Each structure stands twice: as C-alpha cells, then as structure tokens.
C-alpha cells in the first residue's frame, strides 16, 4: 500500500444525545472533545442524534406509513390540475 494516502483510522467513542448510550468503535471521524473510556484510556468523543439505541426501527417503535392515504391526499390536492391539463391537450 502507498504511504500517506489513507485516512487516520483510530478508536472513537460515539454517544447518543437522546439516550446517553456510548460505544467505542473505530472511525476516521475526529473531534476536539474527549472522554475517558472504561479501559482508562482517553478517546475522541462524537455526539450523534440517532444510534441503534434510539432509532425507531431498532427499538421496535417503528410505525407503518399509510402510503395509500398519502396518494389519495395528493390526488385530492393536485388531481384536478392533472385532469384539466389532459382536457386542454
């Protein structure tokens, strides 16, 4: 491999802003903020809005979108315009 062309890949702590859950992984992301981890070492800290701890899909709080209702609502709003354009064409 060529030297000095690869990004710095190092341990980083990611913290979920909503739940406070933190986990240590490797990343190329960097931060000026640091945190002392359970092993006694200090790592860069990156605070994120959503992780697997808070995302609705992974927590089981996922809701199903009513796409049929959304299509009907769209047609109610803009369907008349499309019908008028077809008549004029």
From Swiss-Prot:
Any single GO CC term annotated in Swiss-Prot or TrEMBL for this entry: ribonucleoprotein complex
GO biological process: translation
UniProt keywords, alphabetically: Ribonucleoprotein, Ribosomal protein
Source taxon at top rank: Bacteria
Ribosomal protein recorded as keyword: yes
Gene Ontology MF terms: structural constituent of ribosome
Subunit structure of this chain's protein: Part of the 50S ribosomal subunit.
Cited PANTHER family: 50S RIBOSOMAL PROTEIN L31, CHLOROPLASTIC (PTHR33280), LARGE RIBOSOMAL SUBUNIT PROTEIN BL31C (PTHR33280:SF1)
HAMAP family in the record: Ribosomal_bL31_2 (MF_00502)
Name under which the protein is recorded: Large ribosomal subunit protein bL31B
Organism name: Corynebacterium aurimucosum (strain ATCC 700975 / DSM 44827 / CIP 107346 / CN-1) (Corynebacterium nigricans)
